[in-house]
Amino acid sequence: MTKADLTLSYIDGRPSTVGIKAVNEVLRTVGVHASQTPSPPEARPILEASKTRALSEDEQAQLISMFSLHRSDLLAQIQLAGRTPEVHDGGHLNTSEHGVAPYPKVYDMQAMDQDAKHLVQARFGRLHVNTTDKGVGIDEVMTVVSGGPMTWFYQLPDGAVVKLSVPVVETGGPAWRLSYPGKRPHGAFLDAEHGLIVAYAHGPEKFVMRYEVPSAQGSKALATNPWIDFGGDAPRLLDE
């Protein structure tokens, strides 16, 4: 069986872009960069446990520590994507959405029942931007450390919304890491049976997740997603 690779799909029928190098060439136009990072051996027991149960708060804290990103690491991720930090020197490293736990945090698929998954899919699946009231965005780094597959969406300069398919991460295998700007339209669809994402976001102290920003680049695409059918009982990811 051939191992799945990072794949970028186009809704207009263009051939998919496959492989990390080719995908990054396309996504760099909107400040997005994908990479792989080794999984530390000491993480293996937690990653294995996450296949069958939700992690405890202590295990989540351990996981964040094992996949920690310091200020210099976060700035390096921005540079790899061809961006400059939204806030000088990276800003606050524990930014938060109003009323929501601050970053860094762990998204654990086993911690969600079906109803919770559907709510998350509806919330994150619609294209959105993460900004302050003054329009300052956050810088985001998502690392899929186990499970999957996972899906992200980005809007290209020509207005096309592309689907980025991130393959399954096997226990002990390299993690997939995505760096992208929160101020550009993006989304995610999390439907894996199990999987862990170590999530970092930084910049302004607080931000708001927005589905309507008339002045934002690509604002017409916000609150929609051509790759997801929101009309049924639960959001459904569409094929090409």
Protein language model features and the residues they cover:
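Intrinsically disordered, low-structural-confidence terminal and linker regions
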Residues: 1-23
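General structural signal for secondary-structure boundaries
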Residues: 19-22, 155, 172-174, 181-182
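Active-site region of the double-stranded beta-helix
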Residues: 27, 32-170, 190-240
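Extracellular beta-helix/beta-solenoid repeat scaffolds
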Residues: 174-194
